[in-house]
Every structure is written in C-alpha cells, then in structure tokens.
Curated annotation (Swiss-Prot):
Residues 769-917 are annotated as: Disordered. The keyword Transcription does not apply. The lineage of its organism: Eukaryota, Viridiplantae, Streptophyta, Embryophyta, Tracheophyta. The keyword Calcium applies. Expressed in all tissues examined. Mainly detected in the root epidermis and vasculature. Expressed in the root cap. Residues 795-812, 823-841, 848-858 have a biased composition (Low complexity). The gene is VLN2. The modification Phosphoserine is found at S890. Belongs to the villin/gelsolin family. Residues 782-794 have a biased composition (Basic and acidic residues). It comes from Arabidopsis thaliana (Mouse-ear cress). It is found in: Cytoplasm, Cytoskeleton. This is Villin-2. Ca(2+)-regulated actin-binding protein. Involved in actin filaments bundling. Caps the barbed end of actin filaments and is able to sever them in a calcium-dependent manner. Required for the construction of actin collars in pollen tubes. Acts redundantly with VLN5 (AC Q9LVC6) to generate thick actin filament bundles and to regulate polarized pollen tube growth. Acts redundantly with VLN3 (AC O81645) to regulate directional organ growth and in sclerenchyma development. Disruption phenotype: No visible phenotype and no visible effect on pollen tube growth. Decreased severing frequency of actin filaments. Vln2 and vln5 double mutants have pollen tubes curled and wider at some regions along the tube. They accumulate actin filaments at the tips of pollen tubes. Vln2 and vln3 double mutants show anomaly in the growth direction of organs and defects in sclerenchyma development, but no alterations in the secondary cell-wall machinery.
Length: 976
C-alpha cells in the first residue's frame, strides 16, 4: 500500500485509549472535535474509532462507520473505503462495523451513553447553530432496555401507542409517557434520556413529569400533557413500519468468498474450516460476519466487503441487519459463539506478522506503533479483600453431616475432603455480611460434594439468602478465599468417612498427612492474598529455585529456599512450619548447600527446575446477559458495562476469566433463583468451549444488595443505588427525581374533600355543557381548534383526581370503558364514568377494610387503560350516560351507582373466551408468547384444567378473591 493511499487525517490514530471520530466531507475524512462527539447529522457519514487497552497492555480497535438516513450513496461508499485505510494504519487488525441510523449496534451505542440524537441537516445542506435554533417541541420513541435507541416521531396523538415509551420535550417541561404494555426496563432507561435532555438542553432546570397510559385518575401533569395533544382521547394501536422489522436469527450458514462469488460450505461449523488465505461470510440472519484470513491482501478484503453488501441486497434483508468484519486472531465472542467450539491456539497471531511493509510506511508518516508491540509485564496488584477481623467458621463434610474443625486446624484443607467455610464480617456501618463457600478437594468423592452443596444451601436459607455463595475448587482458590486463612495449607489425603471408604474400595494407599509422616510442602506465596502452601510429591524434582519448601521427616523439618526465592516466601514458610508443628526448630537448607540427610529424606538428589512458574493469562472482565432461544442457551455481551446495566429483573454473568460471578436481581423469579449455579455452569461450559475458560473456575452467586468488594471493584459502584427498592423503573425514578415520582401521597382532609368534590362537579358541568350542543368533532378537528375546550376538560379531570383519588382506594376497579370512536362524546362518557367510579369507590371505602394505598406503579397491569372494551352492555350504558349529560351530574352518578358497583364486583372475574392458550404461552416472560390478547387478563385464556393446575383453585374461587389477592397470585405465577 502506497503512502498516497493512507489519509493524512488518520496520522496518530489509535495511539491512546478513547474515541476518535471523523466526518466525511467532500469525500475526505475530517476530524470531529471532542466537543462535538455524540452529535450525528442525518445527512452525513462518520467513522468512529474506539481504542481500548486490555489488562495485558495491548491495544484493541473497533472501527464503526455510521451512515445517516439522508446521506448520499457516494459518501457512504467513501466511508467504507476510508475505514479500510484506517484499519491499515492500525496494523490491519481492527474489527469493523457498519452502523445504519436507527439500527446501531449495542457496542456502538455504548460509547455514547445514554443515547445519540441524530440531528437534521449535514455538511451539504448546512448546520443549524445554537443561536439559529428556536426551541421546538419534539416527541421521541425510546426503545431498548440496555442500549437506548431514540427516534423522533411526528408530534401528534397518532404517534402514541400502548406498546412503547415516549418522551415529549417541551420548553417548560419534559414528559415521559409510558404505554400500558411497555417494558418496565425500557421505562427505566427512558428516564436516563429524560435526565440527559434536562441537563443538555434545559440547563438542568426544567420540570419532569411521568404520565402513565390509561389512567383516569390523572393529575395536573397528565392533564397538561393531553392538552398539548388537543385534549384527552383514546390512542390507537401500534402500526408497524420498516424500522420496526427486527431480523430473525437463523442457524449460521458459512460461505467462502472467492473472486467475488460465494460458495456455501456444508457441515457442522468448526474453526478448522477457516483458512488464513481466504475470506468468508457467516450468515446468522440478524447479523452478517465477514471473516478475513490474516494473510489476505487488501484488495481481497475490499472485495469481500463488497460481496457482503451485494448479498444483503439480493436477500432483501432488513435495514437492521448488522454487518461486522473480523480479522483472524481477533474474533469477537459473538462471532465465535456460532461455532460448536473454538479451540484456543498456541498463541495469538504475532503482532509483527504481515506488518513489515505497513510498519515501515507508518514510520515514514510519523505514526508510532504504541500498543502494537508486545506489552511489558504487569506488576502484581493486591486485589480487594474482605474486611479483616471477622468470624471464620469451617466444617468438613463427614457422611451426611458437617463436622466443625477445631480452631487450631482451621487452614488445613485435605485434598480428599469437602469443606464449608463461613466468614461473617462488617462492611462499613452495615449489618453483618456473609461469605459462604464450598471448597472441593481434587480427590473428594461426588457424594461429599453433593452433600456440601445441600448443606450450603440450607445455611444460606437460614441466613435469609444474604450470603455471597461460592463454589471453589482445589488449585483455583481466589485471593479473597485464601486471605481468610493465615496460612492456608492443602494436604494430601482426607479425614472424612467417604474418603476413607473410597480408599478401601479402590485398595489405594492412604496418603493422608500426619505430623509424623514424610512430607514436602511447597511455599510460593508472597502476600496475604496468596499465602497458600501445598503438599507435593516427596521427590527432589518437585523443588524449584523460585520457591521455598518445607521437608518434614520424622521429628525434623528442613526449610529449603531456592536461590531465586524472596524474603516474603521465607517468612511465610516459617509461619507454615509453626502452623503444622508448633514449636519445631527449623533446619535451614539453601539451594546448593543441602546436607546428605536432606537428600536422603527426598529419596536422593536429582535435577529440578529453575524456571519461574508461568502465571495465568490476564483477561479483561466481560458482562453477559443470557436467554434460552429455542431451547439453546445463548449469552449477549453488555459493552462498556456499568452498575446501571444490572437490571433488577435479570441475572448476569461477570466473567473475569479467573472467576465467574452470577449476579441475581431482587425481582428475578423465585424458580430462577433456585437454579443460579446450574445456569452459571451452563455459561462456564459455553465459555470453556469458546474462550478456554477453566471448567473448575470459582463461581459465585451474588444477590442484589449484598455485593462484596471483590465484585464491586469491577464497577464504579454507588452503594446508594444498591439499596433502592422496587422494579427497574421505580429504582431509576427514585434515584433521578426523588421518591415523590414513585410514591405519591394524596390524602385529603374531610372538609377539604367536600369542597374539592363540589369544585370538581362544577368544573365537569362547565367543561361538558359548553360543548353539548355542538356536533362531534374528529381528532384532527380537535387538534386544529383552540385549546379552550380541551383545557377545560383537562382541568376537570385534574380536579376530579385531586378530589377523589385520596379516598377512592377500593379493592376492585371497574372494567375499562368500550371506545366509541374519537368524538367528544366518547371523551365525555369516559369522564362521567370516571366520576361515577370515584363516587362509588368513596362510598364503599371504610377505614377497616380499605387496603393501604400503593405507590404509583409502573406495571401496566396496575392501571386499566381507557381504550379496552368489556361487552355490549357497557356500550349501551355509555350511550345512556351521554343522553343525561345535560342533567345535574351528581344525580346521574348516584343513579348509576348500583349498576357501577355490580360491574366493579365483576371486573376481576374471568370472562369466558372462545380461545384458550397454554400456560407457557401466556406467561409474561414466555419464550413463545401469544399475541392479540388482553395482557392484563392473561389468566382468562387458560383452560379450566390448566387454571386449576397453575393456581390450585377453580376459576369461581379465584373470582371471589379480592382484587389485590388476585394480583398477588398472578404475579406469583408470572401472569401479571
């Protein structure tokens, strides 16, 4: 590649961790200043370079080229070419991603948290400056429970629906509208966008309001929200468009790209199919990968990218299909997960391989090679350890019970046994914290391992599930476990009856350590976090010049220290000797000065190694969520993760390669909580086949709110976030805007309530009588007319809310009124129905039987939407109410009270339905959910037999339960 090919704009790119952006202007790459990062114009194309430095010190590169929806084809093509040039500057080892506006990858969006907001215009059409811009009210849809995708939609009622979350950004206030069927986690993420808009465009001073879809007990915020849309009226169903088409994942299909043609490759996918002289296309449906052999030429790589574009066009794939190009040796986890296994090579491809010409060229241009060269050794850091001074208790499994270890033996762990270790400590000013571990010796029998797990679960349950539970295997002990013992010594043999029986059955020699036996103990630790000693074979070949050893022979004990051993190791060896044989006098033997007695005890002098033991590969931590797709266990990586990515309804895996943490949210289903270790083992098996994760890696179960320091060290942890209660939306609302946005107190005094009710009735009469003689308007007419009528109606609804909500807590709610069109008549009927509801509810309420007012819930099932129908009888009732609207309102309400109460009692009853579905289809978290049903009445679609099987009672008995108790049962069985 000649010097002319490399764009000067890329000089110095990728020299330090961070984000660099270039915009394509007149077919040239122009750097974007950091102050403009995150601002993308729809008419332009951008190149984004993300440079990260792993724990080993090497640099990793991701190049994204972002294509705005209004950009020209020529600019998009220029970006693709420039991406190849930038990759050449970086040594040809970057992962490349194509990003389409509105369908960006999670990884790309993770660089610009909480979101990007594409702006109109571009280089060709000109940019609007801040001074030129007049504040414009904007309506957005907000999608995604992890990476947020924000899209501006027309500011009109027709844009709203029951399934999505919307943000209305006005000059004075920002509203978040939660569709009745919207996802709790999407609501929570939308709050982050609201805060971002408030800080960025309102200088952090505007008000924020949360409006829940379908709530008649509206407050002034909701009233003001609907006024902006011309007044309250039913909203329609969601209408799908091209942007909503999500490509389906399909079984991966591999093609070899040769001379621009794609040849399918049959058979099970394996790493051995990929040749380093060729390019391949892996079609996974929702994502297309281009795999590039590390010795392919630049022209071949360009041709492969072009072939992928032609393939997408010929297959008529949705715009949301992602295209990612990976280079051999730097494959992403998502790419490797499509193969049955991905055996680890002897080494990562050499950084120098195939780079001679490129390196020389870069040197001519003054571009350094920092991050490409091999990294320098990393100094060992002491990881976070648990607070010292706690209470340590240890038991070993003996048969079906646990036997406590005497205090003087705590720290001696036998390879043939299993142990339970409970450490109780204080962290700051909090109450007791617990670290409960099972330790499995290499020679322990399966029965003892199962017993240890059972006993640990029993202990955890007795402590109300608060302990951090760990399963730790001999030889893979983590620092925080080793640090509990001062010192820790792993000895041969075992004390348990199970081990003794297994030795007898196999007729094997029992090598159990005793103070009188001949034993050689290796001491290699240097600090409190690795002060572990291990009994090894009593032969001279076990020695190592970089370590210390204790040789026990009868009443004598030698301390042998290699020429390369440290003073810290010598001190630790002395401590271990005192632990094993208190009061023993040590005989020192330095390497090269050993006595004949020493060699005799070892069985004779032999050669031994003088090489330092290699340490495990240091890896960066990765966070994953998981799902079962068609019965197959799959994980999805969360990039640039933070504490806020841990959603309380989910389970996550934090993989550091040395340990695996399974984090369990408070709102996870109880059944899933019981299988956490089994799910974690599935992840370990998967990561073992793809990333070489050791099958005996330590694994922990960590419940939300009980995170230990050795977990939180991987996050910028805020303890206040961890103690907030509620679902994801409630937690986020409390943290960002205070608890008043989640828990509302609407209590009113008696006299004040009478006055407010009178004012509400007057407002209602005024709002409706003023327009009773006018013909019904269409939705568009109401949007175009003056806001006087809608404002009156909004004020009336707000007055009703203030007057009645504080005292209208009843055990049941009336059915949702049937929509009768978008005319003013339907609006009047809804308001009259609302008035009747609150009057009846107040009359029914008594201090003894009224349930405590719940906090304003973000669960759609807590609030009945306005637009759902019940039956034809209700429609006729609405017509009757409309006919009486010229009369005095309170008598009308009184006349309907008896009928309203009857309906209220029947609301929660399960209505007969022609269609029934299975329980698995109706569950809220179903993998194969049913569509086209009333999601607030999922239980109504169960057959009589399956209803009894799930709830344990008949439908009639269920109907007679109070509404709150029905809701509890529905939540319990995931039908809420």
């Amino acid at each position: 590649m000649s010097t002319k090919v490399l764009d000067p704009a890329f000089q110095g790119a990728g020299q330090k961790p961070g984000t660099e952006i270039w915009r394509i202007e007149n077919f040239e790459a122009v750097p974007v200043p950091k102050s403009e990062h995150g601002k993308f114009y729809m008419g332009d194309t951008y190149i984004v370079l993300q440079t990260t430095q792993n724990k080993g010190g090497a640099y990793l590169f991701d190049i994204h080229f972002w294509i705005g929806k209004d950009t020209s084809q020529d600019e998009a093509g220029t970006a693709a070419v420039k991406t190849v040039e930038l990759d050449a500057v970086l040594g040809g080892r970057a992962v490349q991603h194509r990003e389409i506006q509105g369908h960006e990858s999670d990884k790309f969006l993770s660089y610009f948290k909480p979101c990007i907001i594409p702006l109109e215009g571009g280089v060709a059409s000109g940019f609007k400056t801040v001074e030129e811009e007049v504040f414009e009210t904007r309506l957005y849809t907000c999608k995604g429970k992890r990476a947020i995708r924000l899209k501006q939609v027309p500011f009109a009622r027709s844009s709203l629906n029951h399934d999505d979350v919307f943000i209305l950004d006005t000059e004075e206030k920002i509203y978040q509208f939660n569709g009745a069927n919207s996802n709790i986690q999407e609501r929570a993420k939308a709050l982050e966008v609201v805060q971002y808009l408030k800080d960025k465009y309102h200088e952090g001073t505007c008000d924020v309001a949360i409006v829940d879809d379908g709530k008649l007990d509206t407050e002034s915020d909701s009233g003001a929200f609907w006024v902006l849309f011309g007044g309250f009226a039913p909203i329609g169903r969601k209408v799908a468009n091209d942007d909503d088409i999500v490509p389906e994942s399909t079984p991966p299909k591999l093609y070899c790209i040769t001379d621009g043609k794609m040849e399918p490759i049959d058979g099970d996918l394996s790493k051995s199919m990929l040749e380093n002289t060729k390019c391949y296309l892996l079609d996974c449906g929702a994502e297309i990968y281009i795999w590039v052999g590390r010795v392919t030429q630049v022209d071949e790589r360009k041709a492969a990218s072009q072939s992928a574009e032609e393939f997408l066009a010929s297959e008529n794939r949705p715009k949301a299909t992602h295209v990612t190009r990976v280079i051999q040796g730097y494959e992403s986890h998502s790419f490797k997960s499509n193969f049955d296994s991905w055996p680890s090579g002897s080494a990562t491809p050499g950084n120098e391989e195939g780079r001679g010409k490129v390196a020389a060229l870069l040197k001519q241009q003054g571009v350094g090679l920092k991050g490409i060269a091999k990294s320098a050794p990393v100094n060992e850091d002491i990881p976070p350890l648990l607070e010292s001074g706690g209470k340590l208790e240890v038991w070993y499994v003996n048969g079906k019970v646990k036997t406590p270890l005497p205090k003087e033996d705590i720290g001696k762990l036998y390879s043939g046994d299993c142990y339970l270790v409970l450490y109780t400590y204080h962290s700051g000013e909090r109450k007791d914290e617990y670290f409960l571990s099972c330790w499995f010796g290499k020679k322990s029998i399966p029965e003892d391992q199962d017993t240890a797990i059972r006993l640990a679960n029993t202990m955890s349950n007795s402590l109300k599930g608060r302990p951090v539970q760990g399963r730790i295997y001999e030889g893979k002990e983590p620092p925080q476990f080793v640090a509990l013992f001062q010192p820790m010594v792993v000895l041969k043999g075992g004390l348990s009856s199970g081990y003794k029986s297994s030795m007898g059955e196999s007729e094997s020699t029992d090598e159990t350590y005793t103070p009188e036996s001949i034993a050689l103990v290796q001491v290699s630790g240097t600090g409190v976090h690795n002060n572990k000693a291990v009994q090894v074979e009593t032969v001279a070949t076990s020695l190592n010049s970089y370590e210390c050893f204790l040789l026990q022979s009868g009443t004598s004990m030698f301390l042998w220290h290699g020429n390369q051993s440290t003073h810290e190791q010598l001190e630790l060896a002395t401590k271990v000797a005192e632990f094993l044989k208190p009061g023993i006098t040590l005989k020192h033997a330095k390497e090269g000065t050993e006595s004949s007695t020493f060699w005799f005890a070892l069985g004779g002098k032999q050669n031994f190694t003088s090489k330092k033991a290699s340490s495990e590969t240091i890896r960066d931590p990765h966070l994953f969520s998981f799902a079962f797709n068609r019965g197959k266990f799959q994980v999805e990586e969360i990039y640039n993760f933070a504490q806020d990515d841990l959603l309380t309804e989910d389970i996550y895996f934090l993989d550091t390669h040395a340990e695996v943490f399974v984090w369990v949210g408070q709102c996870v289903e109880p059944k899933e909580k019981q299988t956490v270790f089994e799910i974690g083992q599935k992840y370990i098996d998967l990561a073992g086949s793809l990333e070489g994760l050791h099958p005996k890696v330590p694994i922990y179960k960590i419940n939300e709110g009980n995170e230990p320091c050795f977990f939180t060290t991987y996050f910028s942890w805020d303890a206040t976030k961890a103690i907030v209660q509620g679902n994801s939306f409630q937690k986020k609302a409390s943290l960002l805007f205070g608890t008043h946005h989640v828990v509302e107190d609407k209590s009113n005094g008696g006299n004040q309530g009478l006055r407010q009710r009178a004012e509400a009735l007057a407002a209602l009469n005024s709002a409706f009588n003023s327009s009773s003689n006018r013909p019904a308007y269409s939705s568009q007419d109401r949007l175009n007319e003056s806001h006087d009528g809608p404002r009156q109606r909004a004020e009336a609804l707000a007055a009703l809310s203030s007057a009645f909500n504080s005292s209208s807590s009843s055990t049941k709610s009336p059915p949702p009124p049937r929509p009768v069109g978008t005319s003013q008549a339907s609006q009047r009927a809804a308001a009259v129905a609302a008035l009747s509801q609150v009057l009846v509810a107040e009359n029914k309420k008594s201090p003894d039987t009224s349930p405590t007012r719940r906090s304003t819930s973000s669960n759609p099932a807590d609030d009945i939407p306005l637009t759902e129908a019940k039956d034809e009888e209700e429609a006729s009732e609405v017509a009757g109410l409309e006919a009486k609207e010229e009369e005095e309102v309170s008598p009308a309400a009184d006349e309907t009270e008896a009928k309203q109460e009857t309906e209220e009692q029947g609301d929660s009853e399960i209505q007969p339905s022609g269609a029934t579905f299975t329980y698995e289809q109706l569950r809220a978290k179903s993998e194969n959910p049913v569509t086209g049903i009333d999601f607030k009445r999922r239980e109504a679609y169960l057959s009589e037999e399956e209803f009894q099987s799930v709830f344990g009672i008949e439908k009639e008995a269920f109907n007679n339960l109070p509404r709150w108790k029905q809701d509890l049962l529905k939540k319990k069985f995931d039908l809420f």
